């Protein structure tokens, strides 16, 4: 079953409101951090939301996806622009996996030869 993104966004807003009541400084700090990157407005709201969507996908954050999809649409992002941003996210994830694969090979090289030869015979 597909997620009802509009309902999910409402549930998130209610949850964040509750956190804000319990810990207002947490929400205040988040809002200050969130607005800090927007002060110069060099990228524009639509571009910031497209970047946020790409990051949301790489972080696998459903809450981020629902909030930033709505915001991207509100700021004029087209379906094609969103798809391109998601393509960038997919490529970065694949690139990161490839880069981290080299770390596995480095780790393998550090194991004693006796251990690595036992593993290769298994």
Regions found by a protein language model. Give the residues of each.
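Charge-rich, acidic-biased intrinsically disordered regions
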Residues: 76-88, 112-122
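Amphipathic alpha-helical segments within well-ordered protein domains
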Residues: 34-35, 52, 69-73
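Iron-sulfur (Fe-S) cluster-binding segments and ferredoxin-like electron-carrier domains
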Residues: 27, 67-81, 105-108
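C-terminal structural segments of small proteins and small subunits
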Residues: 83-108
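Short cysteine clusters
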Residues: 61-64
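Acidic, glycine/proline-rich low-complexity segments that act as flexible tails and inter-domain linkers
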Residues: 1-47, 100-122
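Immediate flanking context of iron-sulfur cluster ligation sites
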Residues: 42-59, 80-89
